[in-house]
Amino acid sequence: MTAAHFMTDPQAMRDMARKFDMHAQNVRDESHKMFMSSMDIAGAGWSGTAQLTSHDTMGQINQAFRHIVTLLQDVRDQLGTAADRYEHQEENSRKILSGS
């Protein structure tokens, strides 16, 4: 599919929006697993500053993944809005051209 076709095909936009939503869900799920598994690594030799540093680093990484999820969801929403807007404009153009 060419970019020009994509930008004039509301269904293709919605299909792509669903893909972005799936990617957002995958990133969210996998980052949650990663964060939770990092909380379980503390042991007898893993405490104090090392543990605090690890938890701080993992918190920052988790925050970065949340930002990625937000970006993916924003793209999803914008594609859906663009598809609706294009369909509405297309319908208005048809009415104008048909004289209704």
From Swiss-Prot:
The residue ranges crossing the membrane are: none
Superkingdom, taxonomy of origin: Bacteria
InterPro entries per the UniProt record, alphabetical: ESAT-6-like_sf, T7SS_ESAT-6-like
- One of the Pfam families matching this protein, by short name: WXG100
NCBIfam families referenced in this protein's UniProt entry, alphabetically: WXG100_ESAT6
State the similarity comment: Belongs to the WXG100 family.
Q: What is this protein called?
A: Putative ESAT-6-like protein Y
The taxonomy runs: Bacteria, Bacillati, Actinomycetota, Actinomycetes, Mycobacteriales
